[in-house]
């Protein structure tokens, strides 16, 4: 879809009031009006408790329907409320992407005793003990669900490792011992082998496990009528399984079923290798672009803005790039904290929303606010969304000649007249002369991002002098 926009419709610190699905339903019309075409919803199944953001996934088959872990609803609401929210979004032609947490399971119902080997947390290929008995939280029986939808039960033979020995009360990384059992291959090589992330780590070499997860995938797509998945923590999951999972889903639901993977590593080579390994079955979040923007926001005028797209997916493999500014993991106080500083947030959104390439993803925290505090950025994001919808079409020409002042020109096409965005990290006001085309001679262009600049008249050479204030952005469009 041309000029589509995704929104991550949650942040880490949402209230545990069970009303999030209701809020989403009520917001559907507004999301459509601002140009949102896809909504990434949080993990919608039962976690370790009602407070779980969703990444401590306990029972994928419980979408807020069964009394488990002390609650029927999830943090976000009930299954019925979720279904109603999705139906409302679909009325406005907005796709829904469910966050799929397939790497691990949390909140086991019972412990089991089994042989394990402790490994070095800094290199999981190095064993630091002989095999010994531990008591691990690996037995999942889902008593509250009572076999509805799936009778599958989980035990230690279906996992690769845990991080806690209940017998000794000791934390560590324990690799489960069994026939042909080892860490999954086809994962990131960080820490030797980055199969293990948290909780009870699922063994994707086990055929029964693969079939159960694929069965769940097909079921949840049909049950909720979702249009895609956001695949969590893919660098910890066997890449062959990831390709198989998405292929099998599409065999049932069609090639248009969407997927974007979270591979959190600022290494373009690794991300390109991953795309190749999974046969380009999924898009990826552009982590490299996020970190470039993070560095730019920290280093202010010392950052060379001409390098903002260096080592990014959107530059190297644009059809697979989901561009984003921040998310629940990068927001302040989170595990992978790297939040873009406030002054640069408008720059960052201008770079992703006015660009030709990439599928841009808004962050709930940037748009609505974090922890109940209203975001100061909503007005500028709204303005950029308006320009994306009404002006940002055609080819993209980057004017990256000055380390502190850069410009992006969308040339326009058909009835859409294009736009110019000028971005500055300089500590002084600037002006940049750009050629927008001789056919635009005499046109009047206005600045719409709140600078208060006088209009620009395009001269007989098709050029205009576009201004920008210190450390600000200016967005110019043809005046009607």
Where do the PLM segments sit?
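Substrate-binding cleft of carbohydrate-active enzyme catalytic domains
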Residues: 74-108
């Amino acid at each position: 879809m041309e000029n589509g926009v995704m929104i991550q419709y949650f942040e880490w610190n949402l209230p545990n009031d069970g009303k999030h699905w209701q809020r989403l339903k009520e917001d559907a019309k507004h999301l459509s009006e601002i140009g949102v075409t896809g909504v990434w919803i949080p993990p919608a199944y039962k976690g370790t408790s009602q407070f779980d953001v969703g990444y401590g996934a306990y029972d994928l088959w419980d979408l807020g329907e069964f009394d488990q872990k002390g609650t029927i609803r999830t943090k976000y609401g009930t299954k019925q409320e979720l279904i109603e929210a999705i139906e409302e979004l679909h009325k406005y032609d907005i796709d829904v992407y469910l966050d799929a947490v397939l790497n691990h399971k949390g909140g086991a119902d019972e412990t089991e005793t089994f042989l394990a080997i402790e490994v070095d947390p800094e290199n999981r290929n190095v064993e630091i003990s002989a095999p010994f008995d531990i008591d691990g939280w690996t037995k999942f029986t889902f008593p509250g669900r009572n076999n509805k939808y799936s009778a599958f039960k989980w035990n230690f033979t279906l996992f690769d490792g845990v991080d806690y020995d209940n017998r000794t009360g000791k934390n560590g990384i324990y690799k489960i011992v069994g026939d042909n059992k080892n860490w999954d291959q086809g994962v990131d090589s960080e820490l030797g082998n980055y199969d293990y992330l948290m909780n009870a780590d699922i063994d994707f070499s086990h055929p029964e496990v693969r079939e159960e997860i694929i069965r769940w995938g097909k079921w949840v797509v049909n049950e909720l009528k979702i249009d895609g998945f956001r695949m969590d923590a893919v660098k910890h999951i066997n890449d062959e399984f990831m390709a198989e999972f998405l292929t099998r889903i599409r065999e049932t639901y069609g090639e248009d079923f969407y997927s974007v993977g979270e591979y959190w590593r600022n290494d373009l080579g690794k991300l390109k290798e991953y795309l190749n390994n999974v046969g380009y079955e999924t898009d990826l979040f552009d982590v490299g672009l996020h970190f470039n923007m993070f560095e730019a926001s920290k280093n202010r005028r010392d950052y060379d803005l001409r390098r903002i797209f260096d080592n990014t997916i959107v530059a190297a493999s644009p059809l697979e790039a989901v561009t984003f500014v921040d998310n629940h993991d990068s927001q302040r106080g989170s595990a992978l904290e790297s939040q873009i500083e406030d002054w640069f947030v408008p720059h960052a959104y201008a770079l992703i929303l006015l660009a030709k390439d990439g599928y841009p993803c808004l962050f709930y925290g940037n748009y609505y606010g974090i922890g109940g505090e209203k975001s100061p950025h909503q007005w500028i994001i709204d303005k950029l969304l308006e320009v994306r919808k009404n002006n940002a079409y055609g080819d993209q020409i980057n004017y990256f000649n000055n380390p502190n002042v850069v410009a992006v020109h969308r040339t326009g096409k058909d009835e859409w007249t294009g736009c110019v965005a000028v971005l500055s990290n300089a500590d002084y006001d600037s002006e940049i002369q750009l050629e927008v085309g001789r056919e635009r001679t005499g046109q009047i262009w206005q600045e719409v991002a709140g600078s208060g600049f006088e209009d620009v008249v395009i001269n007989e050479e098709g050029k205009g002098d576009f201004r920008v204030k210190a450390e600000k952005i200016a967005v110019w469009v043809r005046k009607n």
